[in-house]
Amino acid sequence: MKAVTYQGIKNVVVKDVPDPKIEKSDDMIIKVTSTAICGSDLHLIHGFIPNMQEDYVIGHEPMGIVEEVGSGVTKLKKGDRVIIPFNIACGECFFCKNQLESQCDQSNDNGEMGAYFGYSGQTGGYPGGQAEYLRVPFANFTHFKIPESCEEPDEKLSVIADAMTTGFWSVDNAGVKKGDTVIVLGCGPVGLFAQKFCWLKGAKRVIAVDYVNYRLQHAKRTNKVEIVNFEDHENTGNYLKEITKGGADVVIDAVGMDGKMSDLEFLASGLKLHGGTMSALVIASQAVRKGGTIQITGVYGGRYNGFPLGDIMQRNVNIRSGQAPVIHYMPYMFELVSTGKIDPGDVVSHVLPLSEAKHGYDIFDSKMDDCIKVVLKP
C-alpha cells in the first residue's frame, strides 16, 4: 500500500509499505478514506520527538471503512464507516474507565504516556493513518461508528479524530464558563476550534493571538473573536493583561513548542538541549489573571529552562495540561456537527490526494497558500 513515511528531518515521502494485517483478535483493518495532517505532526518532522525511525508511517487523524475484523471484535463489521481517534486505548484499565483514555495503561509498552497512532516509538510505535490502510488495535473501544444515515462528508468528520475534539477538551478541561474572558494563543486548527467552543461555553470575550496574518483574519471572520498579532507588541503578555484589565480568566496555549523561537532556543533545540520554544507559555503566564487558569494543549517535549514557575505560583495561577482523551468526547462532537451547531468545514483549507502529502506538509509547515488544515485522500 501507499503511505506517508518519515525519512528524516523535514523529509516525508509517500512510498510502498507492507499492508497491515490482523495481529490480535481485537484488531481491525480499515480502508482509509480521509486522513488529516495535524500540527503535532510537524513536531515529528522538525525532529523534536525522539525514537523516530526511517520508513515509519505517520499520521493520527484517519477515518474510513472497516475492511476486516478480528475474531474478538463484536461492535463493528465489514463496511462500517468509522472515525479513528488518535488515542489507542483498551477501554478496560483504570484510566480508560475514568475518561482518561489518552493515558491508557495497556496500549503503550514503551513509556509512561498513552499510545497514539503514527507518533514514534515513544507512544507505542504504532504505524499511522496517513496510508491506504490502517490496523486499529483494541478495535471495540478505539473507534467512533458513524451512523449509516449520516451524509456528512469526510472533510467535516475527520477532524473529530483529534483537532476538533482536542479544541473542545481544551475549553472543557480549562473550566471555561459563562461570562469568562478567554485568550487563545494560536490560530491553527486546535486554536480555531477552541475559539468556537469558548463561545459555546458562554464566554463573554474571546481574544485570539498569533503572528500569521491570514490565520488571524480567518479567526476574526469565522469565529468573531478579537485578534492580536504578537509581533505588533514589545511585550504581548503585558499588553493582553492591560486590555483585559488585570488578565484573562483562562489562557489556552494551543501553540506549544512550535511557536516562534529565539536564536538561543533555536541553537538549544538543534543541540537537543531544548525542545522548541516556551514563548507561548511565557505569554500565558503574563496574560492570565490572579487565580486564573492556563490550559496547556500545545505539545511540549522534554525539560525546559526558564519555566515561569515563580510567576505562576505567586499569583495562584492554576495549570491544566495534557493530551486530550478524545474517545469519550467523540459522540458529542459528532452530534454538534450533525446538528449544525459547529461547522468544522471552515477549518479545512486544503484537500489533496495522498500522493501530494509532501506538498501538504510543506504548505502547512511554511504557512503558505493560506493553509490552515490539510486533509489527504488515499
UniProtKB/Swiss-Prot annotation:
Binds 2 Zn(2+) ions per subunit. GO terms for molecular function: oxidoreductase activity; zinc ion binding. Zn(2+) 2 binds at C90, C93, C96, C104. This is Uncharacterized zinc-type alcohol dehydrogenase-like protein AdhB. The keyword Metal-binding applies. It comes from the Bacteria. Belongs to the zinc-containing alcohol dehydrogenase family. Class-III subfamily. It comes from Bacillus subtilis (strain 168). Transmembrane segments: none annotated. It is an enzyme of class 1 (oxidoreductase). The lineage of its organism: Bacteria, Bacillati, Bacillota, Bacilli, Bacillales. The keyword Metal-binding applies. Its EC number is 1.-.-.-. Keywords: Metal-binding, Oxidoreductase, Zinc. Zn(2+) 1 binds at C38, H60. Disruption phenotype: No aldehyde-stress related phenotype. Its cofactor is Zn(2+).
